[in-house]
A protein has these predicted regions:
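Conserved beta-hairpin
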Residues: 38-43, 158, 170-193
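Short beta-strand-loop-alpha-helix junction that forms the active-site gateway
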Residues: 35-36, 41-79, 197-201
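Conserved N-terminal entry element of GNAT/NAT acetyltransferase domains
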Residues: 2, 92-96, 106-113, 127-149
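Acyl-donor binding region in acyl/amide transferases
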Residues: 98-108, 112-123, 145-148, 169, ...
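A short acidic/basic microdomain associated with nuclease active sites
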Residues: 19-40, 258-263
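Short, basic/aromatic recognition patches
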Residues: 140-142, 147-169
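Acidic-basic catalytic patches of nuclease active cores, encompassing PD-(D/E)XK
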Residues: 1-31
Length: 353
């Protein structure tokens, strides 16, 4: 069941930004007459998409059983259930949270420095453009060579073009242009795929660990047809093992299985299983984050009002106490859709193609 809310001044500004963007891109939309923040559009194939703007303060996760009525909210699977229901009816949902539109970071991008860059909102807009066929620069895998990306260049790229920004990995691969095209220069980095060991996910399978595709990101305004296949093929052929750990714990592990956790709040993971890659769909995982509703400086935990943060196991007791006091709220999301494929299966498919 949808929960409606009365928009604040900030919400009205954000809704105007969404509508202005859709108008600028000439994307037809239908604005729902009763549910605030719900817009209906269609992708390039005519399939339905729902854009759902959310003011997170109206949708905290329910903690009333533990802390009483003052901590009442939506169930932990609220967004997940809406996305799953719509997916079962061939409707894609792209969630747009208020804090994603207000997020900023100072970035030294690949082409210029920018302060107060709204990376997450820019990536969401690019996701919508891609779905609706409004991407300006299309490339093919054959336009590129594959090379490892240095950490400095990777950080600049991900902090500009990836929704969650930079995260370290064991292997970083990039697509670099062979020659000038679409206003970009020979040697420009257009797409990256990074790989690493998932420590949390492998706790239950230390003797048969999987490798995670940690970041998959394309430069904003661009699309690379066949780009992911090209990067995966290069990885599978050239990296039968990965070196993980450091010091005395440094060792090699065989690359047997790859897993990709697709952000279900924004991305359409169906392409992972319906494309030529045909990854297996392993299921959905739930997700949530936390938000400070007040400035916090207690027991080593520091945060400012409105700031978003993820799990902090060392501060669990403090966080739970502050949730009970209403100074932190937990916010659910649509979770992740999980896909997997073994290296041998991928190599066989690449050889057949």
């Amino acid at each position: 069941e949808d929960i409606n809310f009365i928009p604040s001044e900030e919400d009205i500004r954000n809704l105007s930004l969404i509508e202005n963007f859709l108008n600028e891109e000439e994307i037809p939309y239908e604005k729902d007459g009763s549910i605030c923040g719900l817009y209906r559009i269609n992708d390039v194939k005519g399939n339905a998409i729902e854009l759902r703007y959310i003011n997170s303060y109206h949708f905290p996760m329910d903690n009333s059983k533990r802390f009483g009525e003052s901590c009442k909210g939506v169930q932990w699977d609220y967004f997940y259930n809406i996305s799953r229901y719509n997916s079962d009816h061939n409707i894609r949902v792209i969630w747009i949270f208020d804090f994603e539109m207000s997020q900023t970071n100072d970035t030294t991008s690949l082409w210029q420095g920018e302060r107060g860059y709204h990376r997450q909102w820019e990536v969401i807009k690019n996701t919508i453009r891609t779905a609706c066929g409004r991407i300006r620069h299309r490339f093919r895998g054959g336009d590129f060579i594959v090379k490892e990306v240095g950490n400095k260049e990777l950080r600049k790229f991900l902090d500009t073009n990836c929704f969650y920004g930079y995260r370290s990995a064991n292997i970083n691969l990039g697509l670099y242009l062979k020659k000038d095209k679409h206003g970009y220069k020979k040697g420009d980095l257009i797409m990256v795929l990074t790989f690493g060991y998932n420590f949390y996910g492998n706790k239950k399978r230390p003797d048969d660990p999987f490798i995670e595709i940690i970041r998959a990101s394309t430069r904003i305004g661009c699309q690379v047809i066949g780009g992911m296949s090209k990067l995966l093929k290069y990885f599978c052929i050239n990296y039968p093992t990965l070196t993980i750990g450091s010091g005395k714990n440094k060792h090699e592990i065989k690359v047997r299985e790859l897993k990709f956790y697709c952000d279900a709040s924004h991305n359409d993971g169906r392409g992972m299983s319906h494309s030529a890659l045909a990854f297996r769909f392993d299921g959905w995982d739930y997700g949530f984050m936390n938000r400070y509703t007040d400035d916090v400086d207690e027991d080593g935990l520091h945060g400012v009002k409105g700031e978003i943060f993820h799990r902090k196991p060392h501060f669990h007791k403090t966080i739970m106490r502050l949730i009970g006091e209403g100074r932190i709220i937990s916010i659910a999301n649509a979770g992740t859709s999980v896909f997997s494929m073994t290296r041998d299966e991928l190599l066989e498919r690449f050889s057949n193609n």
